Amino acid sequence: ISLAGITMLSCLSPTLVCAEQPHGFIDYRHEYLDDTRTHADRVEFGTFFSNGIGLMGELRYNTDEGDKDKWDPSQFGNNGTGLSVVYRFKPLDDKKFWLEPMFWLDTTQYWSTYEYGLSAGYDFSKEWKVSGRFRYDMDKATDKSKGYGNDDRNNRRYDVWIDYRPQKTNFQYQLNLVYYNNGYLTWNDGHKNYTASFKVGYKIGSWIPYMSIADYKGVDKTSSNRQIRWRWGLTYTF
């Protein structure tokens, strides 16, 4: 489900935006996992107001469960939806520092998840920006999920973003580090996990095509195996 931008999505993180003028975005993203060899798609959209409030939605689709090397949008299954509200403000005289509480409601056929989080960031310059987020997720198992032996669970997630947008170029770079402490078996026979991803985008007017590569957990939750996660997409800002 998610988490990682500073101004008009120029730093490639649609869920982190400035409250300076009304604006919005639409983002399409495709994902491929090289070990499971499965595809997934996501469309995210949002609008943000000058008072700091932002509203976002997300639609996710994936290939039929168990199918590998298959990418046929007409055969994609619903992989969940999400709705979010955020509020960005600058509490200090130093206007380079900002805070952003958030709430996200995510639903799939197996879980209804209530996500509460707080982001903080500092804009060192036009080129360098750093932000972080703590998120607490409350997973409520659906009847279908309980049929597989699952129960309600709580999870913690910690994100760090480092954004670099060099002057006199349209390229944009982002490093995202994620640490998970989940209430269920996740990776390496334990409840903890991590993801490290690097993202490159190129701004062309209101469009930002991008690509990312990540060190991602493997299929077997009891081993330390990892796999590569590829993502590429296109963001339109307005």
Predicted regions and their residues:
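Detector for outer-membrane/organellar transmembrane beta-barrel domains
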Residues: D94-F97, T113-L185, Y194
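Cleavable N-terminal export/targeting peptides
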Residues: I1-F25, F238
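Sequence/structural signature of outer-membrane beta-barrel proteins
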Residues: E31-D35, R60-D72, K90-L92, M102-W111, ...
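Residues that define the transmembrane beta-barrel architecture of outer-membrane proteins
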Residues: R37-D41, F45, F76-L83, S112-Y116, ...
